[in-house]
Each structure stands twice: as structure tokens, then as C-alpha cells.
Amino acid sequence: MLHIVKYLEKLPLLSAYLLDGDVVLLTENAIYATAVHSPYRASINDQNLWLVLYEDLHARGWLEKCDPRISVVTMSEFVDLTVTHDKSITW
């Protein structure tokens, strides 16, 4: 399943619903969780693929602050993710 997270405050809830192999894409204000010292960083685990949208990082001046362990994807790649995952949920 593809989990699209737009709001930081939804990250703690998300962990209860994640299954191994699910993909999480951070967008909009949820990109702030990608900072190495973010209090929300603890919500990001190693059992899932965590991605962040480049356009939102760039728009918020957050490119240099993003944890390098989180993969950055473009809008085009985001579209591809929605095509390859038959189920998605937005948080």
C-alpha cells in the first residue's frame, strides 16, 4: 500500500497501520519530519520504504535538511507510484 502523508501530526497514527513492504511518501508539511533531529523522525522505521517529494522540499527550502536515508522523488515518480500501487491512503 502507498501511504501519502501530508500532515506531521498524522505520523504517530500511521505506525499502527503500516505493514512490512508498505511505501510512505511524505508531502506538504509532513516533509519536516525528514530532519535528522525532528521529534517526528522516530516515526520513520526501517521496515518500510520512506520517500519525500522533491517539489515540497524545494518549495520549503528543506533540501539540505532532509535526512539522506530518505529517498527523494519527483512529481513524475510520485505519479508512477500511484500507478504501481493498487491501494493508497492519504493522511
Give residue ranges: language-model regions.
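C-terminal structural segments of small proteins and small subunits
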Residues: 62-91
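Short, well-ordered alpha-helix to beta-strand connector turns
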Residues: 20-21, 47, 85-86
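Short, basic, glycine/proline-bearing loop/turn elements
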Residues: 21-29, 62-65
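Histidine-anchored nucleotide/phosphate-binding helix
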Residues: 4-19, 23-24, 32, 41
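Short internal beta-strands
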Residues: 23-28, 49-56
